[in-house]
Amino acid sequence: MKSSDLENVFAMQLRSYNIIPELEYRFHPTRRWRFDFCLQDEKLAIEVEGGTWSGGRHTRGSGFEADAEKYAEALVLGWRVLRVTGHQVKSGKAIDWTLRLLGKTPRKNPETTEKVE
């Protein structure tokens, strides 16, 4: 599944909980960095990291360095950044973590399909 496909899946998961994020939000005042998903009121950004198993740009050399700089600058600006993989989107872990960060209760535990209390 391509990164954009994974982002579409995650966007649908968010919408199922009536969470409407800003997409490709430019967060830095001088750099062109963007977050895949942004919940501006909560200062929460979610990045779907593609290519984690195929040796994509984000997992090698200069791409990894650039991402580290981006996330450090986001932290300095007060953002919480949740980085998730495609597998975590598909398994439901990414939406679970997002909901918990927002203080919401997930419908089911993504690992066991049991209701979360």
Walk through the language-model features, giving the residues of each.
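Nucleic-acid endo/exonuclease domains
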Residues: M1-E117
